[in-house]
Amino acid sequence: MKADLLQRFIFDELDIRGELLVLKKTVQDALSRHDYPQAIQSLLGQALSAGLLLSATLKIKGDTTLQATGEGELRLLMAEATHRRTARGIARWEGAPDSTSLKQLLGNRAALAITIAPQNGQRYQGIVPLSSDSLSACLEEYFERSEQLATRIWLYESNGCWGGLLLQQLPAARGGEYSAENWERIVALSATLTADELFSLPAEEVLHRLFHEESVRVLQEEPASFWCSCSEERTLEVVKSLGREEAFSILDESGEIEMNCQFCLQRYSFGRERIEQLFDSPTLH
């Protein structure tokens, strides 16, 4: 499957939908801005993949944020994906983490939060304790605990590529045991997918190999990319939240107010004239 593409599909005769995703440049662009240890690079690539897969299950316009926190060597793992199939991410750590276990890296008080923020509508957040070693297992536990639609996620990484497969049970039209049997069969078939197949074969061939006895409708593929939503306007909103007294105190001490985006490291610098305009004007411009 080509890199930096998301392929959605649906089983016409079943109440199940799915997604395939392969990322390369998207993750590389997020990693290149920071000096992450190898273990953190791996997990952040998985988180970006998971964020894009989850966001594609939603019909709304807005952002989906996945955030894992704890008190271990890995303090924060965060990925944010949009309905435009763009993503950004960040991680914070201490020491020299080298474990492949997410649970071990996060340590005590580990938790996973998923936040859905529609452009128009009410923000939703669900938080669950994090108790599994892999991110995919933690996400599946989240869906089980939050009593949402049955969802399975497989995440893959190999030779500088990341990706995944997501399955989701739709609200059953037939109901009962018949739908449960369909779901279990499709899950079992999906579990046979290998990283080599996902990263080297076209999406249509991957789906044919997995589900050649099923009726699968392949939807239009969608490009994915790294994109940071930081801007001068948003940064000025942060400056304004400091208050006039604090902002001008920084100006008196440093001659300017400088801020760097934590995701893309873009630098924003504002002199006295711009800050005076900010506090003298009722709106940002």
UniProtKB/Swiss-Prot annotation:
Annotated compartments: Cytoplasm
InterPro entries per the UniProt record, alphabetical: Heat_shock_Hsp33, Heat_shock_Hsp33_C, Heat_shock_Hsp33_N, Hsp33_helix_hairpin_bin_dom_sf
Primary site of residence: cytoplasm
Any one cellular-component term (Gene Ontology): cytoplasm
CDD domains (alphabetical): Hsp33 (cd00498)
Domain of life: Bacteria
GO biological process: protein refolding
Gene3D superfamilies xref list: helix hairpin bin, Hsp33 domain, HSP33 redox switch-like
Keywords: Chaperone, Cytoplasm, Disulfide bond, Redox-active center, Zinc
NCBIfam families: PRK00114.1
Function: Redox regulated molecular chaperone. Protects both thermally unfolding and oxidatively damaged proteins from irreversible aggregation. Plays an important role in the bacterial defense system toward oxidative stress.
Family stated for the protein in its record: Belongs to the HSP33 family.
Protein name: 33 kDa chaperonin
Organism of this sequence: Hahella chejuensis (strain KCTC 2396)
